Amino acid sequence: MLVALSPLALASGCGATRRAGSAPAQTPAPAPLTASEIAALIPRQVRDRDGWSEAIANALAANEFPLDRPSACAVIAVIAQESGFDADPAVPGLAAIAAARIDRYKAKLGPFGDPLLERLLSGRAPDDARSFRERLTRLRTERDADLLFRDLLAYYEVNHPALFTAAQWAGKLTDLDGLADLNPITTAGSMQVSVRFAEQWARAHKGKTATPGSVRDALYTRPGGVYYGAARLLAYPAPYDRVIFRFADYNAGFYASRNAAVQEQLSRLSGRKLTLDGDLLSYDRNGNPNDQDSESERAVQAFAQRYAPQLSAGTIRRDLLGEKTIGFEGTETYRAIKTVAAQKLGRLAVYATLPQVAVSSPKLKGTRSTAWFAQSVDRRYQTCVATPAR
């Protein structure tokens, strides 16, 4: 019987031992961790460790991940980093952040901005005595902001469709796709998982019962935030030799660490300076690839002219469209780059490297980097996995 191993167990080299000249020996599968054993891995200062451990155990089981120490510690480390074990974290200055976002929208509408926004914010949801403006000034948590903007859109779409349509079109005249883009909450919950990812995951695994509103509501609960966060962290194959690269991917996007290594090697081979951001294509605000060539795509084209003339521009674009999947590694473009890199760069032709991405957010004080995030989470992870059994 083969033992099912988590991606993290594989990355850490666990699972099999072998003596010289003998057939591979299969290590027996460890017993799944219990909720109480997971609780012992959570930092002592965390309130309600039993509740958090139950949420983690249920999330791993629901997503069909092994209930082992590497998986549990990875989730624990991200929760500790992202929210300090708070299902609905408060955001300092959130009211000012949301108001500034609305003011930028208003300013781009010129003379129409003030009267339009005044009408929008003067209304109120049927189940709340406060106006939208009053609620805006009292925002404290992510859920407060999320519900405000969702209530505002729902109220005007149903009760004042003409005003709603005007505001929607006004949004499209700015840099917004619509009023929904005024909502500053794009990551949510204890693991700060991407709302877009959570909605996609829910559609794929929960079907028609998963509406955007229900997914957002779930993210602000302890079970829901951990369920979607664990899925985002662990539910994709990546043969990294160190788990820190998976933590970087959590911050910068699927396979960002692998793709950053590709960019680094392309830069050396093509002579073009590239930002190692883990994106081989450029993307719009909704995550769709742009039509124009990115700097990395142009570097691949320059590489192909010199080393792989069989790669056409069409082949390169087709292959790069799969850069967020494991399947990218089977493409002509990836194989050509890695083959030449191995020949020309030797030890520098690594599989993964930490992306160099500046991370700024209305919810962060100052600017951080993906490397800083990954290293900070990894320190928490290493402490967790080294925790003695109790």
Question: What are these model-derived regions, one by one?
Answer:
Residues 2-9:
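Bacterial N-terminal signal peptides
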Residues 11-390:
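Cell-wall glycan-active module
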